[in-house]
Amino acid sequence: MFRRICKPFILLASTLLLGSVASANPAAPSDSTIALLQKAVTGDWRSAAHKARDQYRHPIETLQFFGLKPDMTVIELQPGGGWYTEILAPVLYAHGHLLEASNPKFADRIKANPAVFGHIGEIIPFDPPKQVRLGAENSADMVLSFRNAHDWLMDSPETLAAVFKSVFDVLKPGGVFGFEEHRAKPFATATESAMALHRIPEDYLIAVALKTGFRVAGVSEINANPKDPEDINVHRLPPDLSGPAAEHAQMQAIGESDRMTLMFVKP
């Protein structure tokens, strides 16, 4: 399931310019962890629309790749509609701790569905670039970001760097930053890709992670989509289909965006 960073020459260039990129298999999840993930993904609290996206988002495989365990302290960054939250919250309920770094409006979603979201331990005020601190240093086992980084880069490269630094600070040594993002073409101009397409080149994000102090512990193709040409705005693809109706069938045939799935570790 591990992959080249983009193509072999990109891996070589990244290694020469940025330092060694480790590609290590994460520890295999236990049977109990797999059972909890399967129960959460098939839970009746998840809507049919959310479940329909599993074919593109691969939640069980993605969280296994990151090494999620039910006794971890996990911070999810900017959960949006809570697609991953409704999976994470039940898995971490009994023995772990889930914190959501979001704006205060996410509290309304928790109140609306306490049976699922009531297990969340805390909402951390998080509004880059104004608020990026995630908590006490060395306090979290894992931080997760699902398709958020282009928003930080759209604000500025400094905002993206500040978020990475905040994640690094809050993680314990050995802690994991599980990262998924819409992928731009290799060596595309990062800021322009973020602004126009809501995508970022993979080599750019790896460079930011290494500069922050992370090592790259794993790179996976779990969420890759070779049908995606990587040169169109991701919102034209499912599920948004924001373009004209005449192109919807074409976009549906492509599926959701091609996405990088990276595992960064704090030494």
Each model region followed by its residue ranges:
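Class I SAM-dependent methyltransferase Rossmann-like catalytic core
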Residues: 33-70
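Conserved class I S-adenosyl-L-methionine
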Residues: 70-80
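Conserved SAM-binding loop of SAM-dependent methyltransferases across substrates and taxa
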Residues: 81-93
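A short glycine-rich, Lys/Arg-flanked "PGG" loop and its adjoining helix->strand segment in the class I
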Residues: 89-90, 158-173
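A short acidic, Gly/Pro-enriched loop at the edge of an enzyme's catalytic core
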Residues: 132-144
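Conserved beta-strand signature within the Rossmann-like core of class I S-adenosyl-L-methionine
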Residues: 174-181
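Conserved Class I S-adenosyl-L-methionine
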Residues: 190-217
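C-terminal lobe and adjacent flexible extensions of AdoMet/dcAdoMet transferase-like proteins
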Residues: 251-267
